[in-house]
Amino acid sequence: MRWLPLLALIVSPLASAVTLDELQQRFTGQPVVRAHFEQVRTIKDMPQPLRSQGEMLIARDSGLLWDQKAPFPMTLLLDDMRMVQAINGQPPQTVTADNNPQMFQFNHLLRALFQADRRVLEENFRIDFKDLGAGRWSLVLTPKTTPLDKIFATLDLGGATYLETIRLNDKQGDRTDIALSRHQLTPASLTDDERQRFAAP
């Protein structure tokens, strides 16, 4: 699933995640979040996992930007109107609700998911939220609607002050682990360069 990085891209700090409602308040209360990511994809029957890393940005009013640096350059931009992916200098590919409605609906749902929108979570997942103590928490989501239930067995999130780990367990027995670090909340608005990247055709 080359669109799996989308699952990593809505990230906000959590001061003390005790309830799901608190998660929602924290996730929606940060205008811009930047972080470093490291992703490990473990594929059944492959001897070595696939590793990648880079930088991500989520802007509440603009969308998300996934900027992979290694092992090859890849950018993924998602806003309310389109999803644009460019790999290693190749011409970008654009997905909209018109040319791929199911994929766009899937990605739009993921954006709402990682804002911890309780209504969306309850409509689409069975929820297992736990306060682990010492400021740490876990959230296990089991899909119950299509297309998520056709792709994933569970989505496991964890963290403390910030969302730190994401594990995607898919129906084929493969696993994707994403570690997020170096979170930055400032500047609280997009820089000129970031704004131009979201505005690019």
Predicted features, each with a name:
Residues 55-108, 176:
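An acidic-aromatic
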Residues 1-4:
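Positively charged n-region of N-terminal signal peptides that target proteins for export
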Residues 48-55:
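Amphipathic hydrophobic-ligand
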Residues 18-43, 49, 87-143:
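Flexible, processing/modification-adjacent segments and terminal tails
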Residues 118-201:
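Gly/Pro-enriched, hydrophobic low-complexity segments
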Residues 44, 72-74, 147-148, 187:
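Short beta-strands and strand-coil junctions in structured, solvent-facing domains, enriched
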Residues 37, 64-68, 83-86, 139-141, ...:
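Short hydrophobic/aromatic-rich beta-strand segments that constitute the beta-sheet cores
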Residues 11-16:
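N-terminal signal peptide c-region/cleavage motif recognized by signal peptidases
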